[in-house]
Amino acid sequence: MDLFEYQARDLFESYGVPVLPGIVADTAEEVRAAAEKLGGTVVVKAQVKTGGRGKAGGVKVAQSADAAFEAAEGILGLDIKGHTVHRVMVAAGARIAQEFYFSILLDRAERSYLCLASYEGGMEIEELAVTRPEALARIEIDPVAGIDAAKAEEIARAASFPEELIAKVAPVFERLWWVYRDEDATLVEVNPLVLTESGEIIALDGKVTLDENAGLRHEGHAALEDAAAADPLEAKAKESDLNYVKLDGQVGIIGNGAGLVMSTLDVVSYAGEQHGGVRPANFLDIGGGASAEVMAAGLDVILGDEQVTSVFVNVFGGITSCDAVANGIVGALDKLGDAATKPLVVRLDGNNVEEGRRILEERAHPLVTVVGTMDEAADKAAELAAA
């Protein structure tokens, strides 16, 4: 789960990471009031879960409350890489002497934690990583030992911080590790971490990604979810405990097991090239069970997607046999009734496949086509979607 900047800022502050005062606002009038409260120069910052805000006009400096009001009017409602700005943060201004970069992330390739830090970093860290990769220190972090005071100083030296700054930045590095460790994060990034003209180290902008699988250990994490920004179909699927991700295609996908579903996406994409470029509309893994209730919930979500013009149900019977899956499909269609309006292509294989196919063929639902192989089923689903 990605956090908004203001949520990351509040999290940093709770762990003692130095941040600037900031106030969240939803309207231009609220921005004016926030600017008056903070006083002096403020920065009005769009709250969206994507990068490139500054270049898109989503970050503006204001010297007065009236200027902040005008800035907010230009930012609220702005589209930034497909994200509409509904909220801004009004942050106190700071005189910056130098920008740095610091992050901790989960290195999936090495199966460990990785710290990235740069004395020469900051907002242009991506360019620096390409043109001068030696300026970006990469330090593996032992998950058990973590980042203590000594390790924080080691990181600062590896990132070429001068000795006079190490005593200032090392405690910040250590506290950012606490955020990462104690909140079960997969990313904690500060870009930029700055040195102000008055000699303070400030986390000026932060990104935090929390591991949703660890949500049961953190009562406060549920409150950080942005229900308003969630895709309504994904929110609906989550209510039924379905593993669903909306895509931009026309063929709805239901399968059991993430690997099978991903393979199904591939074969549908390939088949779609022969039928006008149709593509998968979603990822939906119903897991090991395929009861009528689970299948109905999955179909209800997929059929609610206006882009979907056909559905491909691809199930390999293992612990759950194919006859149970077939009964689940029949029960789901009966349960949905008139809400089921789009053709279904069903491919079953594995445990008790003959009985599963017999159940579907005897039911002879007008929307259901039973196909023998995955390639044939993908081609049929793509053909129906393109019709």
From Swiss-Prot:
It catalyses: succinate + ATP + CoA = succinyl-CoA + ADP + phosphate; GTP + succinate + CoA = succinyl-CoA + GDP + phosphate. Residues 9-236 form the ATP-grasp domain. Belongs to the succinate/malate CoA ligase beta subunit family. HAMAP family: Succ_CoA_beta (MF_00558). It holds the Pfam family ATP-grasp_2. SUPFAM superfamilies: Glutathione synthetase ATP-binding domain-like, Succinyl-CoA synthetase domains. Heterotetramer of two alpha and two beta subunits. Succinyl-CoA synthetase functions in the citric acid cycle (TCA), coupling the hydrolysis of succinyl-CoA to the synthesis of either ATP or GTP and thus represents the only step of substrate-level phosphorylation in the TCA. The beta subunit provides nucleotide specificity of the enzyme and binds the substrate succinate, while the binding sites for coenzyme A and phosphate are found in the alpha subunit. This is Succinate--CoA ligase [ADP-forming] subunit beta. GO terms for cellular component: cytosol; succinate-CoA ligase complex. Pathway: Carbohydrate metabolism; tricarboxylic acid cycle; succinate from succinyl-CoA (ligase route): step 1/1.
